[in-house]
Every structure is written in structure tokens, then in C-alpha cells.
Amino acid sequence: ERDMTATKGLEGIVATTSAISSIIDGALTYRGINIDELAEHATFEETIYLLWHGKLPNRAELKSLMDELAANAALPDELLTQLRTYPPGANSMAALRSAVSALALYDEEANDMSPEANLRKAVKLQAKLPTIVAAFARIREGKEPIQPKSGVSIAHNFLYMLTGKDPDEVAVKALDKALVLHADHELNASTFAARVTVATLSDIYSGVTSAIGALKGPLHGGANEAVMIMLDEIGSIENVEKYISDKLERKEKIMGFGHRVYKNGDPRAKHLQKMSRELGERAGNLK
């Protein structure tokens, strides 16, 4: 008789192996380099190169990557027109998911599955994702999108496209570090979803669209959004205790605490806490 035992959620199941990132004894590494070292000494662009090519770039390789990203950051006019048709109250992740899916329509190499073409498409996606997010953020506020500029980092460009002003270096450094810390995380739900999609020999745009759809969920990346909603609901520091007590009494989850993988603390948290304090000091608000 066949064994019909099922493991819910694939817990403990080895779906594949990876040389890209790993979590061993609570330590996160990208290509064998500890996240602490990368957070303190590497830029997001250097981290992208590391994840894609297995090594940190030299000066020429980094410049080449940054030039390619800058050359591909602008969006097709047709996609900007499409973004303007989205409801202002639409979920930003849903808008991003739809826009990434639409990008495939404007890429003549969309169905070229060669490694060389996929790398070119990865550059296009990496370059355009921040532009999409910034453009939709401005459109929903009734403002015109701002074209990306060349010669600056992804973090700098994103903040510039959001505000129309060159950002404070502290803010750029903070965002850059946050991007490094979140660049990869083993075979999480969104990565798994992307791999399942491309395993059918579907294109990279379909894979990334699947990944964004999974990331949107409140049990994955959507937890970040849930934390922000919770903070808005709390309003001020005086309301924290009652808010949390009421949540616990109703047996509801307190978002932003605990992690399925890290049982003794997330190694990325200390960098985010330090960064938050620096930004708070800059803004004159440490609450």
C-alpha cells in the first residue's frame, strides 16, 4: 500500500541545493561571504554582481554593471501610460506585479532562454523595478513620474525619482544597506515560486511575476507592510501597551516579531536598528 503521508508547507523537504546564499546556525551568507561584512563594506550594486557571478566585482566590472543598469532604467512610454490607468488606491505590490508582467511585451528577447539573454533580462529587470515603484508612487499622488538619472547608485536614483531632489547621503546609505540585507534569502517562498515557474521553461518575466505575487503575501514580504499598518494604527508611543494587550487578548498576531528560520534573532536586524537610529537622529525623532 502506498504511503500517503504529506509534509505540509514542505518543512524539512530539500527541494534543491544552492550556492547563492545559505543560513547555517543563524548566520546568513551570500556566496560564502557573511552578511555582516557585506552590510558594512559592500554596495548594493557590488552585491548584485556577487549574487549573479559568484564573486565581488573589480572596479571595471562594477562600472560596467552600473552603466548597464543606468542605460536600462527608463520605462517604455506604453508602460507609464498603463501605470496611469491603475486605481490610486491599488496595492503597490499588485501594481509592481502587473507592470513586471507587462514588461515582457516590450522585450524582443523575452522568450530567448539562453544564459546570455537571461542575464541581459536580469539587468533590465533590476534597472526598471525601482523606476516602476517610484513612478507609481508619484502617479497615485497626482504627480508626474521623474526620469532616472545616470551616474548614481540604485538607492540614490530611487530616492531621487520619488522626490525629485537629490537625497541626503545618510538616507542613500540607509536604503543601500537595506537593499544589501534583503538581496537574497535562501529558497524562500518567492524564490521557490519563481523557480517552479521557470522550471516549466517559462520566461524570466513570468518567474519574477510569480515571485512578486508570493512576496506580496502577509506571511512573506507583505509582513513589512503589515508592520507599517500596525504602526499607523498605534499612532503614538502612549498607545503601544494597550494596542498590544488588546491584540494578545484577541489572540491576534503581532507583526514584525519572530522568524520561521531564525530562532535566536535575525542577523540582519542589528544593521537595520543601527540604520533606523541614525535616520531618527537625523530627523530629530527617536521614538
How should these model regions be labeled?
Residues 2-287:
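Hydrophobic alpha-helical bundle cores within soluble ligand-binding/oligomerization subdomains
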